[in-house]
């Protein structure tokens, strides 16, 4: 479960960073794109996060929903349909 908590914390930091940056640039929306692979590196190209993850894929879905719900509770509009593609579309 520690790995899951680390994933959620990392995803949450990434979301916060991109959203704050988009707001500063007066963007109307931002796409959080998460890619899970066998690396433990951050790939900044195309704002895609790649982190090591080799356990139950269901935990990824749980983490995505947690992040989306967290953003929605902050008053942001979230596209839940994109979660299946490991993306979260957020309207600012």
Label every model-predicted segment.
Residues 25-82:
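Acidic, low-complexity, intrinsically disordered interaction modules
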Residues 2-23:
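Short terminal alpha-helical segments
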Residues 86-92:
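A generic structural motif
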Residues 3, 82-85:
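Protein-protein interaction and targeting regions used for scaffolding, dimerization, and localization
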């Amino acid at each position: 479960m520690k790995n899951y908590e680390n994933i959620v914390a990392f995803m949450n930091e990434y979301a916060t960073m991109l959203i704050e940056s988009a707001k500063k640039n007066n963007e109307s929306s931002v796409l959080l794109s998460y890619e899970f692979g066998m690396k433990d590196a951050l790939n900044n190209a195309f704002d895609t996060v790649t982190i090591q993850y080799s356990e139950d894929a269901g935990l990824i879905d749980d983490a995505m929903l947690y992040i989306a719900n967290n953003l929605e509770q902050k008053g942001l509009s979230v596209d839940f349909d994109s979660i299946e593609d490991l993306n979260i579309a957020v309207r600012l």
